[in-house]
Amino acid sequence: MKILLLCWRDTTHPQGGGSERYLEHVARYLSDRGHEVIYRTAAHTDCRRKSVRDGITFYRGGGKLGVYPRAAIMMLLGRCGIGSLKDVDVVVDTQNGIPFFGQFFSGKPTVLLTHHCHREQWPVAGKLLASLGWFLESRISPRVHRNTQVVTVSAPSKQDLISLGFPPDNITIIHNGVDPIPATLPQLEDDGRIH
């Protein structure tokens, strides 16, 4: 299968974090099982527009907000058989407050991935952007994705999504994992001078 993952950042982004790491683990898992995985994300300083890491092809374009229209254009082109997103079989749309509306633009089956509701985070974006973002997250996304499979990482996040209007039966919880402890840990020689 050709699988498209959409996320506003990746782990090479200076502000990338846990959500991006989670999605890259999913991408690596899918790639290791023979799937073609494309990760579409925002560009950032000194990044390459296209790179391949762990069998995942990363395409970067747009900034903090520009990533959304850039991804939409690429999905529409792919829908017309043009570009790197042609022949995509399924989309994983990561909603970090704002979804990519991958189902609408790609015309392909889509899974919506969201770690949590961003109600408390929106005010730091400024009044106008916060109002628009919260409107998209709380009003538009639940309606657009009412028949979409939704994945989240905890029971409280599921309850938040239900309170926004997502159908409970469409929400699956897949808990975050942890990396295994290394077999050996690097150690410094203790000569009594290290405190």
Model-assigned labels for residue ranges:
Residues P156, I174-G177:
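Carbohydrate-associated surface elements
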Residues Y59-G62, L76-F100, F105-S106, V111-L112:
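Short N-terminal targeting/anchoring amphipathic segment
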Residues R9-T12, Y29-L65:
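N-terminal strand-loop element at the rim of the active site
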